[in-house]
Amino acid sequence: MAKVVGIDLGTTNSCVAVMEGGKPTVIANAEGFRTTPSVVAFAKNQDRLVGQIAKRQAVMNPENTFYSVKRFIGRRPDEVTNELTEVAYKVDTSGNAVKLDSSNAGKQFAPEEISAQVLRKLAEDASKYLGETVTQAVIPVPAYFNDSQRQATKDAGKIAGLEVLRIINEPTAAALAYGLDKKSNERILVFDLGGGTFDVSVLEVGDGVFEVLATSGDTHLGGDDFDKKIVDFLAGEFQKNEGIDLRKDKQALQRLTEAAEKAKIELSSATQTEINLPFITATQDGPKHLDLTLTRAKFEELASDLIDRCRIPVEQAIKDAKLALSEIDEIVLVGGSTRIPAVQAIVKQMTGKEPNQSVNPDEVVAIGAAIQGGVLAGEVKDILLLDVTPLSLGVETLGGVMTKLIPRNTTIPTKKSETFSTAADGQTNVEIHVLQGEREMASDNKSLGTFRLDGIPPAPRGVPQIEVIFVIDANGILNVTAKDKGSGKEQSISITGASTLSDNEVDRMVKDAEANAAADKERRERIDLKNQADTLVYQSEKQLSELGDKISADEKSKVEGFIQELKDALAAEDYDKIRSIIEQLQQALYAAGSSVYQQASAEASANAQAGPSSSSSSSSGDDDVIDAEFSESK
């Protein structure tokens, strides 16, 4: 069976892993790194850049460099108000869906399309490593992702040309990686603070069984928020001193964001860091520079509210699991933001335990996804994963109330049904409004979609019996069916959420991505051809110089002619001609080289024939003969 990879599509960085020889292996990307920045950019010539190369040019191209896209995926425009102020690129929220605007590409992209580019790169890098095309993947998502966000992640995989075999929760994936070899039963709390989201899951792990007891989280809390605290501090100090708000300058904002991330990382190991941003802006008085010292204590003061927000999901998960903190055996830290000392301190303070840091927080989720991929591919045996749905699911009933059919933390896959009736005499149809959330009123919860059941025979109110069935699959994705028991009429909906893409949009994006992949391949081949031609020109000129008079004037002229033709073809970017002349130039060089060897061979042969007569005449005298004296060693 083909290999199934695990891809951790992170807010800040992404990672891919695979099972090899019964063990999970992290696959380095084409650049040699084990993680890849989740960044996609469009250059002025419309070239698409992904990963490290995209991140490096962000300062010079802030409006066409897309990062932290995971915070927009599967969300409606009214759900991303806070995120809009944290990015330098333009986010269009005027329609029914969030769109990311690229002036260089001349079009708008859905967040799923941008995420798909990161997934495609990781899949291609994995394909090169494995020597076979990767088409199947397991993709983890934050445990607190709602149905729309899960479906959107699956759509991103489809656009990338991947069959997403399973969507699993990130803390659960981390627990798989941590507990793969655990024999004794342990209760573990996974504290997953990534770049854009925060999850807490409580699990029982042992003898190959991974049972999620409860999960909680905050999808608006992550490393990006810590960065923003530093950005606001730097911008505020600069505005205080210079009267200029750097946040209004896209390029300056991008530089501040990069400096903030760097400072945050440095403060995990140092007690203070210098932030120097020369020429951050300019006025009529000349250039302005930003030069500040940020201490760890000041950073912790700035981020104190964020650190406090970490408490609530931990307390909620423990409560839902019906456990006391003293009953937790291990605290496993996941996500790059758990390297922040203040975060580690609050975990220790809350639990009274030293956090377990035996796993790499940047790689553990991808490793767990690879293990799940191994389970699905039949490579890994004797593992049972029992995950849960993070939020309650239900329908709107009379009076605008949410009636829950599936409570949060229900083990999945699951199926639940409830029988409802009509609210008016003679009512022949009902509208089913599907909701997700914990509030009592329907309007306070997340709307996942609506559908109508028609053809109900007229009857007094309360008489018709309408069965509503909720089915959650192993991916945590919901299907809802409504059936009138009297007439047998049935209607169903696969919930995709108002903010995600229609099937037609996904299909179009898949075709666009395939076309772009072909264009990218052609562009890469052209670059490789130009590089090959440039190298050949250099080597040919060097070889002619070294050979000098050893080749005939005709051969030299022929090679020089092809070199000039190749230079002209390169200037004109005539790739067919470049290909043709490369071949002709190589043949001319081979011919010139052969003639030099033939000439050298002929000269050596002539010298060999003349050699014996000259040597015998010179040896006839004994003027040059030296007698050696030997002494016998005893």
UniProtKB/Swiss-Prot annotation:
PANTHER family: HEAT SHOCK PROTEIN 70KDA. Signal peptide: none annotated. InterPro entries: ATPase_NBD (IPR043129), Chaperone_DnaK (IPR012725), Heat_shock_70_CS (IPR018181), HSP70_C_sf (IPR029048), HSP70_peptide-bd_sf (IPR029047), Hsp_70_fam (IPR013126). Residues 600-634 are annotated as: Disordered. This is Chaperone protein DnaK 2. Residues 600-620 have a biased composition (Low complexity). It holds the Pfam family HSP70. GO terms for molecular function: ATP binding; ATP-dependent protein folding chaperone; unfolded protein binding. The modification Phosphothreonine is found at T197. Acts as a chaperone. It comes from Synechococcus sp. (strain ATCC 27144 / PCC 6301 / SAUG 1402/1) (Anacystis nidulans). The keyword tRNA-binding does not apply. Residues 621-634 have a biased composition (Acidic residues).
